[in-house]
Amino acid sequence: MKLSPSALALAASIVASTSVFAADTVSPVPVLLQDLAKYQDAEKTTAKNIETFDTLDFDVYTHQKWDRLGESHAADILVHYPDGHTSKGLHDHIEELKPMFVFAPDTRIEQHPVKFGQGEWTAVIGVLEGTFTQPMPIGGGKTIAPTGKPFKLTMATIGHWTKAGVMDEEYLFWDNADFMKQIGLGH
C-alpha cells in the first residue's frame, strides 16, 4: 500500500505527538504497567478471598468447625440475614449458625456454582442442603416434629473483606418461604 504525502505527514505528526520522544509528553507505558500491577494484585486478593470463602463453606461451616470461623470472619463481623435482622460479632454469628444443625444435622454446602469479586467485595452463590430429621426447637421448650424432608436451597453471600483477609460485613440471601415449603412447614 502506498500512502500519499499528506497521509504520511498526518501519520508522522500523530506518531510525534504520542511518541516517547516528544518533548511535551510522557510515555503512557509506565502508567499502564502500574495500573496492570494494581489490577493483578487486586485479582490475586480476590482469588485468595474466594478460596478462603470456599474453605469456610465446604469445611468450616459444613463440619461445624466453629473455632475456625475467625479464619474468614473478623471478630466484629456484621452479618445481615434474609429476614432483615443482623448480628454483630463472631460469637453471635456462630450462635445464629448452630440451630440449623440441631434439626438438620446433615446440613452442608458442597458447591459454589458462581463466585466472583472485585476489590474488597466477593459474591458467591452456594447450594445449602440437608434433611429435617430431628425436632426443631421453636422456643419455650417446644419443638416441631421432624418431617424427614430434604431441602436444597440456593443462597447468596456478599462479603466485604478487610486487608487482613477476613470479612467484616456479610450479607446472606435465601428464600425462607421456599425453605419452609421444602421441609414441609409451608404452603
Cite the ranges covered by each PLM segment.
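C-terminal and inter-domain tail/linker signature
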Residues: F21-H187
